[in-house]
Amino acid sequence: MQQRRPVRRALLSVSDKAGIIEFAQALSARGVELLSTGGTARLLAEKGLPVTEVSDYTGFPEMMDGRVKTLHPKVHGGILGRRGQDDAIMEQHHIAPIDMVVVNLYPFAETVAREGCSLEDAVENIDIGGPTMVRSAAKNHKDVAIVVKSSDYDAIIKEMDANEGSLTLDTRFDLAIKAFEHTAAYDSMIANYFGSMVPAYHGESKEAAGRFPRTLNLNFIKKQDMRYGENSHQQAAFYIEENVKEASVATAQQVQGKALSYNNIADTDAALECVKEFNEPACVIVKHANPCGVAVSTSILDAYDRAYKTDPTSAFGGIIAFNRELDAETAQAIISRQFVEVIIAPSASEEALKITAAKQNVRVLTCGQWGERVPGLDFKRVNGGLLVQDRDLGMVSEAELRVVSKRQPTEQELRDALFCWKVAKFVKSNAIVYAKENMTIGIGAGQMSRVYSAKIAGIKAADEGLEVKGSAMASDAFFPFRDGIDAAAAVGVSCVIQPGGSIRDDEVIAAADEHGIAMIFTDMRHFRH
C-alpha cells in the first residue's frame, strides 16, 4: 500500500544523539520544519539548524526540571490529529500537524545497571513524555511517521528522496511496529526493576532484595526464521536479546556457509560457552549439545588434534569451537579429516576462509574476543511456566579445593583435575569426564546412573586406545555410592574431583583411599539438564 504522506514538520527529542545532527540536517535541507526540546534543540541550534523549541511553539514553558515539556494539546493534537477528519478542530485551536516524530527514551537500563544506582536515580530516568509521543505517533501511523531507531535514519531519507519528500504507509506501519516494540521493552525494564525492588522498599534484607521480580517481562528480537525446529515437523525461529555485552552465538557473524539450523545454534552455543572456560589455546567439539572432545595446548591446531582423538566417531558432523583465531593450518586439518557442521572462533584469517570455502556446507562464525563473563539469567520452559535461575558462572580456584583423601594429588593430576572439572560443567548430567595431560580421554554423559556414566567414559577411552592409567576424573555432582570410584579405579584413574556432599561421603572417600586415588572436593555442583 502506497498512501504517501509528505513530511513537512518533524519533532525531534532524543536521549541517544547518535546520528541526529546529520538526520536533522537532511530533513531541514528537504524543507522540513524542525521542532525540538531541551538538549536536542540546543544541539541542533549550535549546529546552525533552524529549530523551534517546543515551549515556544506551545507557549508553555518546560517545567519541573524537564518533567513536563511535551505533554501539551498542541503537541499531541498535532501528532494524533487525523488528516482530513480533524483539520477544522486543529485549525480552530492553532494546532499544526506534526508529520514525523523522532524520539528515543531516557536511558533507564543503563542507569539501573550502574553500581550504586538509587531508587531516586532510577525514577528520574523514567521517561514520560517520550513514550507518550511514541505511542501517539504509532497509533496515528496512517498519517505520522514515528522513528525510534537511529539505524533507520538513512533509509528514511532515501525513501523521501524517492517519493518527493513523502513516506509510504508500508514504511509508516513498519516504523509503528518498531515503536510499540520499543515502548513495550522500555516498560518491561521498568516493571522488572521495580518488581525486584519490592523487598528492599519494604525494609527486608539485602538478600531478599535480590529475589526475582514478581512479574517477569522478556523482550527478544527475531533474528531469523528457520526451515524447522529440533525436528522437521516443528516450526522455529531464533530470537536474540538487545545489547548483548558478551561474545555469543547470538551476536556472532556468519561469514560462510548456508543458514544455521535450530540444532546448529543450540550446539554452537554449547561449544562456545565451554571453550570460554579456558585461557590457553583450546578446542571444544560438541555433538548433540554435549562435548565429545576438549583439549588445550600451545596452539589451536594441536588442541584440535587432541580434542578430535577423544572420540572421532562422535566428532563427525559436530560443532567445533576455538578461543583463538582460526588459522589456515587448523582449517586445513579440519577439512581434510572430518565433516563439520559449524566452526566458531573469535576471528578467522582470510587464508582459513579460503580453505573452508571449498566445503560449501561448512558454516563459519566469528564472534569476537570475549572478556569477563557477564552475569545474566537462564531460562527453561516447562508446560505452563518458566524456570528462571542465575547463569552458572560458578568457578573454583586451586586455593578453594579440598583434598579429602589420604594421598595428595600430584601437580599433573591437579592440572588434569581442574581441566576436566571445567569440561564437566558443560556435559549433561549425570556427567563424568576422564582427562589426561590437558585433553579429554573419555566422556560419559546424560546417564540416569552416575556409575554408568563412569563406565561409558572408560569404554570410550578404551575404544580409542587412549591410556586411562594416571588420569583424572571429574563428576558434576557427588557420588551417592562408592561404585563410581570402583569403576574409575578399575580402568586406572588416579585422581577424582567432585563436589562432595553425599551422606555417604565417608564411604566414597574410603573407596578412594582403598584404591590409592587422590580425591578433591570442590563444594560446588554443576548439574546440567
Curated annotation (Swiss-Prot):
The keyword Membrane does not apply. Keywords: Hydrolase, Multifunctional enzyme, Purine biosynthesis, Transferase. It catalyses: (6R)-10-formyltetrahydrofolate + 5-amino-1-(5-phospho-beta-D-ribosyl)imidazole-4-carboxamide = 5-formamido-1-(5-phospho-D-ribosyl)imidazole-4-carboxamide + (6S)-5,6,7,8-tetrahydrofolate; IMP + H2O = 5-formamido-1-(5-phospho-D-ribosyl)imidazole-4-carboxamide. Its EC number is 2.1.2.3, 3.5.4.10. One of its GO terms (biological process) is 'de novo' IMP biosynthetic process. Pathway: Purine metabolism; IMP biosynthesis via de novo pathway; 5-formamido-1-(5-phospho-D-ribosyl)imidazole-4-carboxamide from 5-amino-1-(5-phospho-D-ribosyl)imidazole-4-carboxamide (10-formyl THF route): step 1/1; Purine metabolism; IMP biosynthesis via de novo pathway; IMP from 5-formamido-1-(5-phospho-D-ribosyl)imidazole-4-carboxamide: step 1/1. The keyword Cell inner membrane does not apply. GO terms for cellular component: cytosol. Residues 1-148 form the MGS-like domain. InterPro entries: AICAR_Tfase_dup_dom_sf, Cytidine_deaminase-like, MGS-like_dom, MGS-like_dom_sf, PurH-like. One of its GO terms (molecular function) is phosphoribosylaminoimidazolecarboxamide formyltransferase activity. It comes from the Bacteria. NCBIfam families: PRK00881.1, purH. Belongs to the PurH family. The IMP cyclohydrolase activity resides in the N-terminal region. This is Bifunctional purine biosynthesis protein PurH. The lineage of its organism: Bacteria, Pseudomonadati, Pseudomonadota, Gammaproteobacteria, Enterobacterales. The gene is purH.
